[in-house]
Amino acid sequence: MVEAQIPSLVPIPGVKLGLANIVTIFALFAYGPKDALLILLVRVVMGSIFSGQITTVFYSLAGGLLCWCVTVLLRKFLSDRQIWVASVIGAVFHNIGQILVAIVMTGTPGIVVYLPVLMVSGILAGLFTGLCAQFLFGKLRNLGQF
């Protein structure tokens, strides 16, 4: 909801920072998969309601759930100093999930040609949000919150 108020950095449809993912990836590493999933589901539903675009729930859920599954698996192999890695890989799978939904909803497999553009933006956004989550995690850990 907050991110919708920020002007797009690039004039490409579907490309955004994914600031809400900072909270989800942070929650996954700080509190575990269940809490991260709850946060993901609530923010997707609330975002769709407040944006007034109910169809976005399908794209957001597909991308978010695929991202969540992958990052839950990665969490088993990564330390809390590698949150950014999970975020980057999760962003890639988030984009794959969204493209798959777009193909199903439109019946146009040719949409897959848009995937490389989304991959580049997803990797950059995933790196940014992952570094933010990792920074937050480190600061709160130093304050004795974990």
What are these regions (language model features)?
Residues Q53, V57-F58, K76-F146:
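Membrane-embedded alpha-helical hairpins and interfacial helices in multi-pass inner-membrane proteins
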Residues E3, P7, L28, I39, ...:
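Alpha-helical transmembrane segments and their lipid-water interface positions
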Residues M1-A27:
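Hydrophobic transmembrane alpha-helices
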Residues A4, L28-F29, S48, V72, ...:
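Transmembrane helix-loop junction
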Residues L19-P33, V70-L74:
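Generic transmembrane alpha-helix motif of multi-pass integral membrane proteins
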Residues K34-K76:
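Helix-adjacent hinge/juxtasegments
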